[in-house]
């Protein structure tokens, strides 16, 4: 089952968002209110502003005009197209424990080690340094760290990039029971 923090009444509200790069208008007067448990898929051609919209929601990019209101109980988790910088000398288990030792579930709690096993890092790999992982394993580890932070709004920017089939199946199973909002494309 998935984990996530409680989501209050106010979630994420976009009001009259406008964003351009040079002469290219990506969004004009875009308004949307995300509701509890929404599953929102953003579609569009390459370069149409899908990632920019996600970055605006996350606060990584400012709109040219309009407002983004984030509710007080909202905890965003943003899985970007690029991995965050990882300390290659850290052990896998320590990287995850830096996010959380345990995460709460509706049935109790799950340890960082148990979550690592669930995401295909057996105990024999958990004390390996990050520098020894493959690119795909680092991507999976980055995803797990975001999930360990117990977000209730999960933004997945091209989550299928560099994830193997097993990890995609795990992610889909996780999202089936995720008790919050999911915003994504290409899943």
Regions found by a protein language model. Give the residues of each.
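Conserved catalytic-core segments of large NTP-driven translation/proteostasis enzymes
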Residues: 1
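ABC ATP-binding cassette signature C-motif
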Residues: 4-187
